[in-house]
């Protein structure tokens, strides 16, 4: 320990220079605790406040669907090209190398399959385990307008309450019932309810008409789901339109890992999200990277 006689008086105190602490500018997140902001800053690039997430959590209800038969073979080579990985704790522990050094959004709801009612989910991960896995956020479905709406909202509330206690963001993922219309009115309702319950990030679907109203009416960042597999040019157009209309990023799965050139597709999506490239320019990049 330094002796008092060895301590030199400080001289450069910057007198007259106001103390600097740049504001956290991610939409709706400026008043969150430091730990939660720190995790969100790993998910959303602080230079753009946007993100490219790679979702490969589908097996929690679909099993080994096309493209996810072998995560170690099909998905692991993509890790370095994504900003964030979204997966289950089972896959994270068994296949994702800790040295991949990518922030993780951990799937935290489940307990059903494609053989049953998908809306009947429960919280499937303890917050302590999410912390143990060094997750940057937890994610759960919310099914507005379905038979199990109440339980899915309770799941979000539970994760939000526990997340606030530990500094862990919650991403609410808007599921859609079989008979629900995927339109602006529905997603405006679903995203706003999830945000009002305290979710710090919302994942939802892009719609061709009125998406800018969905994004404007949601007080926290929205990332869009990729949804079903589209031709690469169409998927890039969807990304561009979503970002242009207010989305803060994408969380894509099938449109990446079922692409004929997944790495090239990730690079093209990255160009749209972080460099504001239009779909045509991004598609040319895709073709170039595809070779």
From Swiss-Prot:
Q: Where are the transmembrane segments?
A: none
Q: Which domain of life is it from?
A: Bacteria
Intracellular or extracellular location(s):
Cytoplasm
Q: What is its main location?
A: cytoplasm
Concerning CDD domains, the annotation shows:
DhnA
Any one GO CC term of this protein is: cytoplasm
Q: Which reaction does it catalyse?
A: dihydroxyacetone phosphate + acetyl-CoA = 3-hydroxy-2,4-dioxopentyl phosphate + CoA
Q: What is its EC number?
A: 2.3.1.245
Molecular function GO terms recorded: acyltransferase activity, transferring groups other than amino-acyl groups; fructose-bisphosphate aldolase activity
Identify the NCBIfam families for this entry: PRK08227.1 (NF006081)
The Swiss-Prot or TrEMBL record describes its family as follows:
Belongs to the DeoC/FbaB aldolase family.
Q: What is this protein called?
A: 3-hydroxy-5-phosphonooxypentane-2,4-dione thiolase
